[in-house]
């Protein structure tokens, strides 16, 4: 598709055409093997940052109408000629139309058992599931993937949240069943408003590693090759599964534009 390929964007050509930009992460080992070898987790995070995030960010820019060739300052060689091209939001039109078509009618989850249905209704009401599903659908259309994060909060409530594909991924085993080993969430601690930070401080990432038994909390720094160090003790959970689920728009993990 022309939005995603954008053949004139020479400065980003390597990022656009990287075949591993839609790679599904797999690990030939157990969850404990990964936890015992944190450098392997760092390698996955580094690859996601370098190979996948640039493409995902570009797709989000297109959705917001930030067309690279139109928005850049020097966009044509003939400086003496006019350039009246205008930025457009065709990507937004495509995504919003498809999202409305797919999720305009709420997904129904029903049970024949009255007590079960009552619990489902309470859960759906608490989490505004219809809006939540539409939000997941938006990410599916833009990025080709979406992530749902389930937690039990301090009030002992089960809550559903969306996790950004630009800082979330799942690592699977190598079996044909494609079982989730763990999910990774990471984010940069420093913001654009942060001032007077050293080079080390401005490149710190917080990393959450979610397994089927617990969530582990790490700190990493791009200056030290994203080497992980524990930032606080792990917290056990009782879900018995990795609580981040990845949804794909299609087999190729491609969006709608």
Task: Describe the role of every protein-language-model region.
Residues 39, 55, 166, 234-238:
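Generic low-complexity segments that are intrinsically disordered, proline-rich and/or Lys/Arg-biased
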Residues 23, 128-132, 165-166, 238-244:
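Short amphipathic alpha-helical surface micro-motifs
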Residues 1-161, 177-178:
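Extended, helix-rich architectural segments
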Residues 127-231:
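Extended, Lys/Arg-enriched charged tracts that mediate electrostatic binding to polyanionic substrates
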Residues 218-257:
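Extended, charged amphipathic alpha-helical segments
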